[in-house]
Amino acid sequence: MGVKRILACVECRSRNYSTKTNQQSHTDRLEMKKFCRTCNRHTLHRETK
């Protein structure tokens, strides 16, 4: 079953993206480089609690 995970920008803390992942295969926190509209550039986005 997919779990909804919200990604927040590391620099400005803006919550820009939401994804669904498999809970069993992704036990650690998700990190991706994505475009942040607030910063207007590509930054690291981490999963929030």
Swiss-Prot record:
InterPro entries per the UniProt record, alphabetical: Ribosomal_bL33 (IPR001705), Ribosomal_bL33_sf (IPR038584), Ribosomal_zn-bd (IPR011332)
One Pfam family per UniProt: Ribosomal_L33
Alphabetical UniProt keywords: Ribonucleoprotein, Ribosomal protein
GO MF term set: structural constituent of ribosome
Ribosomal protein in keyword set: yes
BP GO terms, sorted: translation
Keyword Cell wall biogenesis/degradation: no
Gene Ontology CC terms, in alphabetical order: cytoplasm; ribonucleoprotein complex; ribosome
Entry similarity comment: Belongs to the bacterial ribosomal protein bL33 family.
NCBIfam families: PRK00504.1, PRK00595.1, rpmG_bact
Full protein name: Large ribosomal subunit protein bL33
Lineage: Bacteria, Bacillati, Bacillota, Bacilli, Bacillales
